[in-house]
Every structure is written in structure tokens, then in C-alpha cells.
Amino acid sequence: MSCYENLVMKTQMNYSRHYSTYASGGTAVVLSKQKPLPYEEQIQEFVRRVQEAECIIVGGASGLSAAGGGDFYYSDTPSFREHFGKFADKYGFKGAFSGMMHRFSTRNEHWGYVATFLNTTQNAPIREPYLDLDRILQGKDFHILTTNQDTQFVKIYPEEKVSEIQGDHRFFQCSQCCQDETWDAVQPVADMIAAMGEGTMVPDELIPRCPHCGAEMFSWVRGYGNFLQGKKYEEEYEKISKYIQKNKDRKILLIELGVGRMTPMFIQEPFWELTNSLKDAYYISVNSEYQFLPEFIEDKGIAILGDIGTVLKDLRKAKEESAFV
């Protein structure tokens, strides 16, 4: 097991023990009682830390995509209506995830919805917060860790710089995990969308099936069933683990963006542990709802409460202005 996966396993056990605390929007970790710096000073400190860092690890979660308009997962937003309107009108869905959990009466309509869901993320443009983040990271040695499955990061960076530890909407797996393989999902999704047209169902012959056992395919993502934790899964963890091992003695900046209360064990709490254990590590989080800075790293981090898109834009501008000072 790689070092980062081991950290995740450790924090998952903590999450299970204190589930009710996390489910109510809290954390089981004792938080700092220090008063946060004013926003403008936080941005200046952020800029300074980026400039001084010898390497950076960015942990990008759902709040990052939501800040750029990818906010259709949990609620009935304009973007949800834009992409899923025909299903919302027919079934009364109030967010994309509610449709993914729905038991459709036919597999044809189930796959019509899945294809719509995957097509929405596969073909989404690179969202503005990601572009601002890219400008902030220019000239730096960095690695991306993400729980997002929406392919935003791999539209900007080469695969070797991104660890997608929760899966990727570009791939299918066998729903029965009969083989340790993943297959392309982009072309099958495009074919289903074309065949579906204005309707909500795809024809039988386009329902994706495993070439080995004949079972239906399944999106290679955690959250809906038998997530294949095989070779590709381990490769994603190996990338981030090797980066940490290679840079553990350098001045490393850990940036956490948009972690919610459902998945603190994949980015947030491992970042806290790394900040504490690595001598020259520093931690910065940005979140629109939670301002969590553990007491045990209160002198090695800051937590910024604010819209992630706004913070990244302000940070980019401040970084660019500082280059001319």
C-alpha cells in the first residue's frame, strides 16, 4: 500500500468512528481558537507562500468545480436545468446525483441518464477557477490530487501530474469487476447521446457491456457500486505517493480547495497529517462554508473562508501584481 493510501485508510477509520460529527458539518479534530487574519492579509500570505514554496500539492474537491458553474450535482440549479432539464421535468429530480440514484424502469432509460451525466462533464469547458489556479501555479513544481471525477484537471495537465483517486468519467469498468481493466467511455457516451436525441432512452445495442463476461459496464468512479480498485486505482495513489516521497524534505505547500464533509478523509485530513509530520510543510485551505484549521498545525497554516472562485481570482491578480513590484 502506498504512503498516501495508508494516510487515507487511517483517516477513513476516524471518519467512521465520528460519522455523526462529520454528517452534521463538523470535524472530530480539535480546531484552532486563533482569530483568522483579515481577508486581504490572508491573500498576501497566500501569495508569499506560493512564491516561497519549492513544490506545491493541490487537493481539489467538489467545491472547486462548483465555484466555476459545476454546481448541478446536489441541487436544482440553472446549470442542472440546462443539462438535465428533460429528466428533471419527467421525474422531478432536484440535482444530478438524485438521478444517478434513481431506479429507472428500463435499462435503456437508465443509460440515457448516465450518458447525459457523463457527457455533461466530459465535454464541459475548463472552468474559470481552474484557469486561475493554473496561472497561480505557473513556474512552480506541483502535483494535483483530486477527488473530482469530472476530468477538469486532466483537460489542463498531463496525466502524470494528476492523481484521480476517486475515478474518472472518461472510463468504464465491468460492473461485476470480472477483469482488472478499464475501457474508454468517451466514444460510447457520444454514440448514446447521438442515438437518444431529444428522448430519454438509448437503444439496446448501445448499452455498454463488458467484452469478457457480458455484464453491463459501470462508470469507473467511487460512489455508485463496485468501484474497481485495481491496477489503475493503485497507479493514481502511486503518483501522489511518489511525489510526496521525492519532495518530503523540501519546502512544500499543501493547498486544499473545496473539501466538503462527505469526503474529508481523502484530501483534508491527510493534508493535516502531512503538514504536521513534514518539517517544512505549510497548509492553506479555501472553502465557502467551513473554516477549519486544526490546533496542532495552527502555526503552519491558514484557513480562508470565501467563494473559491473569488479567492483564486484575487490570488492570481495579487501574484501577478507582486511580480512587478
List each model region and its residues.
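Conserved catalytic alpha/beta core of Sir2/sirtuin-type deacylases, generalized to analogous enzyme cores
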Residues: 2-325
